[in-house]
Amino acid sequence: MCALLVGLTGCGPFLYAVDSIGAGSAVAQAETAGAADRAPYEYYAALSYLEKAREESGEGHYDAAIRYAQRAHDLGNRALTRAREAGTAGGERE
């Protein structure tokens, strides 16, 4: 699959779309888990990276957009994990 993608021209938008969808999902799950209150650094950083990814994509800078989307995905997952841990430690159930 990778060899096929390398051979294609203009695959940046496709790769960005895949990463962006994953990042958006991770951030949305973190929000649902209460990450804005329980893991604010990771949550708001993920939002910022996702916004920057969208901005870079809009300008046609897909390599940068992909990197920002991947970072947003990572931080969104961290925010989700921390929010769940904080909820469990606080006696709440998800």
Located regions from the model:
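Sec-dependent signal peptide recognition
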Residues: 1-2
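C-terminal motif of bacterial Sec signal peptides marking the signal peptidase cleavage site
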Residues: 6-10
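Amphipathic, heptad-repeat alpha-helical segments
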Residues: 12-43, 47-50, 90-91
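Helix-capping and short linker residues that terminate individual alpha-solenoid repeat units
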Residues: 31, 35, 58, 77-78, ...
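Short, charge-rich amphipathic alpha-helical segments embedded
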Residues: 63, 73-91
